[in-house]
Amino acid sequence: LITDEVYDRIVFDGEHVSFVGSDDERVILINSFSKTFAMTGWRIGYIMSANKEAMTQMTKLQYYITACSNDAMQYAVLAAFENANDYPDKMCAEFKERRDLICSRLNSMPGVQCHVPEGAFYVFPKVEVPGMSSEEVAIELLKGGVLCSPGSAFGKSGEGHLRFAYTISRNDISRGMDKTEAVLKRLRGE
Protein backbone atom coordinates (compact mmCIF):
# COMPACT_ATOMS: atom_id res chain seq x y z
CA LEU A 1 0.00 0.00 0.00
CA ILE A 2 1.49 3.32 -1.07
CA THR A 3 0.01 6.17 0.95
CA ASP A 4 0.45 9.70 -0.39
CA GLU A 5 0.23 12.03 2.61
CA VAL A 6 1.62 15.27 1.16
CA TYR A 7 -1.49 17.19 2.28
CA ASP A 8 -1.51 15.76 5.82
CA ARG A 9 -1.17 19.23 7.43
CA ILE A 10 -3.71 20.90 5.12
CA VAL A 11 -6.96 19.37 6.40
CA PHE A 12 -9.88 21.71 7.12
CA ASP A 13 -12.73 19.46 8.12
CA GLY A 14 -12.18 16.31 10.11
CA GLU A 15 -8.81 14.83 10.90
CA HIS A 16 -6.01 13.36 8.81
CA VAL A 17 -5.70 9.60 9.32
CA SER A 18 -2.23 8.23 8.65
CA PHE A 19 -0.93 4.75 8.08
CA VAL A 20 2.29 5.69 9.93
CA GLY A 21 2.89 3.48 12.93
CA SER A 22 1.02 0.50 11.57
CA ASP A 23 4.30 -1.50 11.46
CA ASP A 24 2.91 -3.18 8.38
CA GLU A 25 5.79 -3.82 6.00
CA ARG A 26 3.42 -3.46 3.06
CA VAL A 27 2.90 0.25 3.81
CA ILE A 28 5.07 2.83 2.04
CA LEU A 29 4.41 6.44 3.04
CA ILE A 30 5.21 9.36 0.74
CA ASN A 31 5.27 12.88 2.17
CA SER A 32 6.57 16.29 1.19
CA PHE A 33 7.88 19.47 2.75
CA SER A 34 6.83 21.27 -0.42
CA LYS A 35 3.15 21.43 0.55
CA THR A 36 3.59 21.63 4.33
CA PHE A 37 5.89 24.65 4.25
CA ALA A 38 4.74 26.28 0.99
CA MET A 39 7.85 25.18 -0.90
CA THR A 40 5.75 24.12 -3.87
CA GLY A 41 7.79 23.27 -6.93
CA TRP A 42 10.87 22.33 -4.94
CA ARG A 43 9.90 18.64 -5.00
CA ILE A 44 11.53 17.93 -1.66
CA GLY A 45 10.09 15.18 0.47
CA TYR A 46 10.62 11.73 1.88
CA ILE A 47 9.52 8.10 1.84
CA MET A 48 9.13 5.89 4.93
CA SER A 49 8.47 2.20 5.33
CA ALA A 50 9.15 -0.61 7.79
CA ASN A 51 10.03 -2.71 4.72
CA LYS A 52 13.84 -2.60 4.67
CA GLU A 53 14.14 -4.23 1.24
CA ALA A 54 11.72 -1.73 -0.33
CA MET A 55 13.63 1.15 1.28
CA THR A 56 16.96 -0.23 0.00
CA GLN A 57 15.61 -0.41 -3.55
CA MET A 58 14.04 3.06 -3.38
CA THR A 59 17.28 4.50 -2.02
CA LYS A 60 19.15 3.06 -5.01
CA LEU A 61 16.54 4.44 -7.39
CA GLN A 62 16.67 7.89 -5.79
CA TYR A 63 20.46 7.89 -5.81
CA TYR A 64 20.74 7.08 -9.50
CA ILE A 65 17.94 9.38 -10.64
CA THR A 66 18.32 12.54 -8.56
CA ALA A 67 21.12 12.08 -6.01
CA CYS A 68 19.84 14.82 -3.68
CA SER A 69 18.24 18.22 -3.50
CA ASN A 70 20.54 21.23 -3.47
CA ASP A 71 22.02 22.55 -0.23
CA ALA A 72 19.88 25.70 -0.13
CA MET A 73 16.69 23.65 -0.23
CA GLN A 74 17.93 21.32 2.50
CA TYR A 75 18.82 24.27 4.75
CA ALA A 76 15.42 25.85 4.07
CA VAL A 77 13.64 22.68 5.21
CA LEU A 78 15.84 22.52 8.31
CA ALA A 79 15.05 26.17 9.11
CA ALA A 80 11.34 25.47 8.66
CA PHE A 81 11.50 22.57 11.11
CA GLU A 82 13.50 24.54 13.66
CA ASN A 83 11.75 27.91 13.42
CA ALA A 84 8.37 27.60 11.75
CA ASN A 85 6.67 24.54 13.14
CA ASP A 86 3.46 26.54 13.70
CA TYR A 87 3.46 27.84 10.11
CA PRO A 88 1.52 24.88 8.63
CA ASP A 89 -1.35 25.46 11.08
CA LYS A 90 -1.51 29.17 10.25
CA MET A 91 -1.27 28.38 6.53
CA CYS A 92 -4.05 25.80 6.84
CA ALA A 93 -6.35 28.32 8.55
CA GLU A 94 -5.71 30.82 5.74
CA PHE A 95 -6.32 28.17 3.06
CA LYS A 96 -9.63 27.32 4.76
CA GLU A 97 -10.70 30.97 4.45
CA ARG A 98 -9.67 30.97 0.79
CA ARG A 99 -11.47 27.67 0.19
CA ASP A 100 -14.66 29.02 1.71
CA LEU A 101 -14.43 32.16 -0.43
CA ILE A 102 -13.77 30.42 -3.76
CA CYS A 103 -16.42 27.74 -3.15
CA SER A 104 -19.00 30.33 -2.18
CA ARG A 105 -18.27 32.42 -5.25
CA LEU A 106 -18.28 29.44 -7.62
CA ASN A 107 -21.49 27.98 -6.17
CA SER A 108 -23.24 31.33 -6.62
CA MET A 109 -22.62 31.20 -10.40
CA PRO A 110 -25.30 29.68 -12.66
CA GLY A 111 -24.21 26.37 -14.17
CA VAL A 112 -21.41 25.82 -11.64
CA GLN A 113 -21.41 23.21 -8.89
CA CYS A 114 -18.44 23.16 -6.54
CA HIS A 115 -17.89 20.46 -3.94
CA VAL A 116 -16.25 21.91 -0.81
CA PRO A 117 -12.95 20.02 -0.38
CA GLU A 118 -11.88 18.81 3.07
CA GLY A 119 -8.21 19.60 2.47
CA ALA A 120 -5.45 20.61 0.03
CA PHE A 121 -5.74 23.86 -1.95
CA TYR A 122 -7.64 23.02 -5.11
CA VAL A 123 -11.28 23.02 -6.14
CA PHE A 124 -12.68 20.98 -9.01
CA PRO A 125 -16.07 22.48 -9.88
CA LYS A 126 -18.40 21.16 -12.53
CA VAL A 127 -18.83 23.99 -15.03
CA GLU A 128 -21.57 23.72 -17.65
CA VAL A 129 -21.12 25.72 -20.84
CA PRO A 130 -23.19 24.11 -23.62
CA GLY A 131 -21.17 23.09 -26.67
CA MET A 132 -17.77 23.70 -25.06
CA SER A 133 -15.20 21.30 -23.66
CA SER A 134 -13.43 22.00 -20.38
CA GLU A 135 -10.28 22.80 -22.35
CA GLU A 136 -12.13 25.37 -24.46
CA VAL A 137 -13.62 26.96 -21.33
CA ALA A 138 -10.19 27.04 -19.65
CA ILE A 139 -8.70 28.76 -22.71
CA GLU A 140 -11.46 31.39 -22.69
CA LEU A 141 -10.89 31.97 -18.98
CA LEU A 142 -7.16 32.38 -19.65
CA LYS A 143 -7.95 35.00 -22.29
CA GLY A 144 -10.06 36.71 -19.62
CA GLY A 145 -7.19 36.73 -17.13
CA VAL A 146 -7.93 33.58 -15.09
CA LEU A 147 -5.60 30.60 -14.98
CA CYS A 148 -7.14 27.19 -14.34
CA SER A 149 -6.69 23.65 -15.62
CA PRO A 150 -9.27 21.86 -17.75
CA GLY A 151 -10.76 18.87 -16.00
CA SER A 152 -9.98 16.71 -19.02
CA ALA A 153 -6.28 17.00 -18.10
CA PHE A 154 -7.07 14.65 -15.21
CA GLY A 155 -8.76 11.96 -17.29
CA LYS A 156 -12.05 11.37 -19.08
CA SER A 157 -14.13 11.70 -15.93
CA GLY A 158 -12.71 15.20 -15.43
CA GLU A 159 -14.39 16.52 -18.57
CA GLY A 160 -16.91 19.21 -17.69
CA HIS A 161 -14.85 20.34 -14.70
CA LEU A 162 -12.12 22.91 -14.12
CA ARG A 163 -9.40 22.91 -11.48
CA PHE A 164 -8.58 26.13 -9.66
CA ALA A 165 -5.83 26.52 -7.06
CA TYR A 166 -6.54 28.90 -4.20
CA THR A 167 -2.91 29.59 -3.37
CA ILE A 168 -3.30 33.31 -4.08
CA SER A 169 -4.58 36.07 -1.78
CA ARG A 170 -8.27 36.42 -1.00
CA ASN A 171 -8.33 39.72 -2.91
CA ASP A 172 -6.88 37.99 -5.97
CA ILE A 173 -9.38 35.13 -5.60
CA SER A 174 -12.23 37.66 -5.53
CA ARG A 175 -10.90 39.42 -8.63
CA GLY A 176 -10.40 36.08 -10.36
CA MET A 177 -13.93 34.99 -9.53
CA ASP A 178 -15.30 38.30 -10.85
CA LYS A 179 -13.49 37.61 -14.13
CA THR A 180 -14.62 33.96 -14.14
CA GLU A 181 -18.24 34.98 -13.69
CA ALA A 182 -18.00 37.56 -16.49
CA VAL A 183 -16.39 35.08 -18.91
CA LEU A 184 -18.93 32.35 -18.15
CA LYS A 185 -21.82 34.80 -18.67
CA ARG A 186 -20.32 35.84 -22.01
CA LEU A 187 -19.85 32.20 -23.09
CA ARG A 188 -23.47 31.42 -22.23
CA GLY A 189 -24.68 34.51 -24.10
CA GLU A 190 -26.08 36.17 -20.98
Explain the meaning of each model-derived region.
Residues 1-190:
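PLP-dependent class I/II
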